[in-house]
Amino acid sequence: MILNLLMINPFFKNTGPYNLNYLLKAIDLKDNNYPEDKINDIKDLNSSKKNEITFLHSRKYSDLAKKTKASYCLTSENFKSFLPNSCKVIITDKVLLHTAQITKIFYPDSITDNYDNTVKDINDTELKKK
């Protein structure tokens, strides 16, 4: 997994730990009331541990989800039943976006593809004629 490579790559410095409520407010999940837990990192389902956050966005990872050691998981309402009781669920309808945003907080110097909302359809530009 790409996210896993980012986590073990020595060129990317983890700036954590962060308070869970800080992370959730930073990604606009303000209606949640979670404890003041410190989160050390964001990792994939397989390599995550206690005091880390992970994510589940597809049913094909349900077997990994059942075994995760993460304290928290970003997921949708549809997938929360795949997680063990030891992993607290954070419900979102934007799992991958929120995962990317939290990853950027932990690894601000990593290379990212920030969404460019200035991009236009080629038919709306001068390049159409070329």
Model-predicted segments: where are they?
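Domain-scale signature associated with acetyltransferase and cell-envelope carbohydrate enzymes
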Residues: 2-130
